[in-house]
Structures are given as C-alpha cells and as structure tokens.
Amino acid sequence: MNVLRDTAKPAREHFDDVEAAQVTEGLAESAFAMRQDWDGKPWNPPAREQPGVYAWGEAHLQYAYSLQFEATGNRRYLDVLVSRFRQLLALRDDRSGRLDEVRGRVMPAWGSVRFSTRPPFEGKSTCWAVHAGMILYPAARFVRMVQADPAICRRYAGPVAEFRQAIMETLAAYEENWHENVPQSGGDTEGYYTEPMAGPDPLPLNQMNTLGRVMLELAVADGDIQYRKRVENLARFTKRRMHVNGRNALEWDYRPGLSPPFDS
C-alpha cells in the first residue's frame, strides 16, 4: 500500500493511513512489518521470547506516536503509546526471570539471542545497551512531554510515575558498564559505555548515545543533575572524536577509540 503517493496530505495524516491499514494490537517485530523480521522471516525464537528485537520495530512505532502527539496535540496517540509500552514492560526480562547469559544475572531490560553471533557468546541471550536505549526513548519522551503540559499532567500522572521508575531501573542496570576518562591532552571528563559482548572498548557512538538521549529526556523533565552530567560526558566523548574532512564537513568514526588519532 503506497500511502505516500498523495503528496498533498500532511505527514501526520499519512501516519493515520498507515496505522489504520497495518498497525495491530500486537507489537511491531521489525521496522518493515508487524510480524516477522526485516528479511520477512519468523523470528527464531519468537520475538516475545527475545524482546530485545523490538528495539528495531516497536520502538520506532512508539516514537512515531510521540511525534504524532507533538504534531497534533491529540491525546489518543499518548493513550496508544501508554498501552503499547506497558506491553513491552511486561516482557522485560526481570518480569519473567529470564537470565542474561553473558552478564550472569537477570536484567531489568530486554534480552535477545539474534545478535549473539560471535564465540564464546554465540547464541547466548543478553541485554544490549542499545536495545534498552531504543526501547526506553519513546517512554522517556512521554514523561518529558506530559510533565511540560499542565493540561494533561494530572491525566497521565500514573503512567508518568510508572514509566519513570521503569526507565530508572533499566538505566541503573547498565551502571557497571559506564566509564569516565580524562583525556591525555587535558580538559573536562568524558564518558562512555561498554558492552560485555563487545569487549572493553567503547561502544559505537550511536549505541551508547541511545542511553544518553533517554537520560537527556529525564534531565529536561525532572532537572536531574546526575543524568545531565552523564549526557554532558557522553557529548564530550562524541565531540572530541569529530574532525573536519576535506569537504569542510564534520566526520567521525563509527566506533572510535579512547586515544587519537580519531580520523582513521
């Protein structure tokens, strides 16, 4: 169904067309379809048994609902977001006692085996930080948007408290993977995340900063100083690894290291 053919329609109306035609009550299993992965194949094991994969499907859809509310002010989009995020919370590993086989403990996050492809962790369930960040982001936006709007803050007070607590629990679970570093050249402290599956080097910038943008939303919503400092440290880490290329444009490596050169 090519709903984008009618270019006279605003983008927000295109979303409603897609929603009516394709969105179901079940969670979106990929960015391209409500069911199956991005190759059109069933997840093995099923997505509900490795819910980290919803980071690349349902998380995008819930983000779209948050954007639709910003664009229209229609509370229906928030109601749907609340309902769908609660489905994700019910699948969090600690709700079922699912073990993170890499960390050796149960995490308040969403594990998967799909991306565990390298020995010695091949086929092991683990809760990737990037998946947690992707899944939490729409809920963090929800908390920030509701608290900024006196007209709706009372209506959604319950979900705001519920989601904030859940977000904080998940963020805290990755605290052991947070590191701070003072550059050899001097300057303010920077920070980065690692992942047991990926070794001691800093995670790719896009992966670690999914957690950063979640913390940024809560810092704006609640004025949390610790989250703000964490975001600033992540931003310094990223900024110091940017360089100007031959076309006078900023450029950065996907996964830069701790020490220069950063323009490999």
Residue ranges and their predicted role:
Residues 49-53, 69, 73-76, 123-127, ...:
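Conserved aromatic-histidine-acidic binding/catalytic patches
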Residues 1-122, 165-192, 237, 241-256:
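Low-complexity, Ser/Thr/Pro/Gly-enriched N-terminal "stalk/linker" regions
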Residues 1-17, 59-75, 134-156, 210-225:
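Well-ordered alpha-helical scaffold segments within catalytic/enzyme domains
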Residues 49-64, 76, 83, 126-138, ...:
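Aromatic- and histidine-enriched alpha-helix N-cap/loop-to-helix transition segments
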Residues 98-132, 142-159:
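Substrate-binding cleft of extracellular glycoside hydrolase catalytic domains
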Residues 139-251, 258, 262:
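Eukaryote-skewed repeat-based solenoidal scaffolds used as protein-protein interaction platforms
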